[in-house]
Amino acid sequence: MRKTFCLLFIFSVFFAENLRAKINIGILKGMDSIPFAFLYSDAQENQKKLENPEVSELSYVSEEVKDSSEDQSVQPEEKYSFSFFETPLELFSKMKAGYIDASIISSESAEKLVKKSNGQVCVCASVTSIDFKIVTRRKGNISFSDLIGNKVYVAGEGLAHSVFRALLAKNSVPVEEGSAGVEIVVKKSQAELVTEFLSKNADYVLVSEPALSDIFNRSKNARVAIDIQEQYETVFGYGKKLPRSVLVVRRDLAEGSPKEFKNFLADVEFSVQRASRKPRGAAGIAAKNDFGVNKRISAQAIAGTKFNFYTMPLD
């Protein structure tokens, strides 16, 4: 009896470490989850084929979305399940509780989640780099020193705000009200920045996609004054890129199921590459599956996104 129990215990431990149920992916609605688009589409399509093997094509998948030339031998539907979330708070709660294994979120949100999870959640890859740009109607070449005496509108006090202040400091431009420095006006969201710019209340706004595309679609006079990523590399060194969005996973997935984790990283990277090459296809998938993006501007916004997938140390 004891021998049988020991064998069963060893058997169960072996399979617990080597066989994992579906990886549960959380999709936080918005631009940051666009890199999951093709992974999600493949999973849904293959699930339909499993349920009805005689169906060779899915009627709901448009020609724009189909990509038979990039068909993979893997079957994502056997490995992944997906849940959608409206807010980071909802996603964080499920990840900490162990119901969600992985997600793509902003680097700012990731920092908060890692701290709140007490190490249960970790960052494992960069997905996109910052695409912040200062937009204006004013013509001519504009440098940081040209911003002195002006107001620059930003959303929140997160990554964009911090990087902007750092670049101003590196260029010896003071942050203060009046004619001697740059005044930073903080708004709650980038949607507010778009409104302020279009209503001509703001001469300079610091925005990223999809707000950037929204402005250019609605204002003929808008132009990029300063590309923050380019300036960041000028100051801190060529090739230095700050992640805008990152892939976060539960540590028990990364360390407890290394084979599945490695395959998952490869599948996500492939999905990111496809979104980069086929922004219209990614936009179509996102619009059909309620990723929380506006189809009117999402294809343009995806095309302007700086996809930059690379893995990172877990600690």
Describe the role of every protein-language-model region.
Residues D146-G149, V246, K306-F307:
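Flexible glycine/proline-enriched surface loops and loop-helix/loop-strand junctions
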Residues T4-V13:
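Sec-dependent N-terminal signal peptides
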Residues K22-V185, D203-E209, A225-I226:
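Short, glycine-/small- and polar/acidic-enriched structural segments
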Residues E108, S117, V185, S189-I285:
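Pocket-lining segment of extracytoplasmic ligand-binding domains
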Residues A16-A21:
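Boundary at the C-terminal end of the N-terminal hydrophobic targeting segment
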Residues M31, N217, G281-D315:
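An extracytoplasmic/periplasmic, membrane-proximal ligand-sensing/linker region
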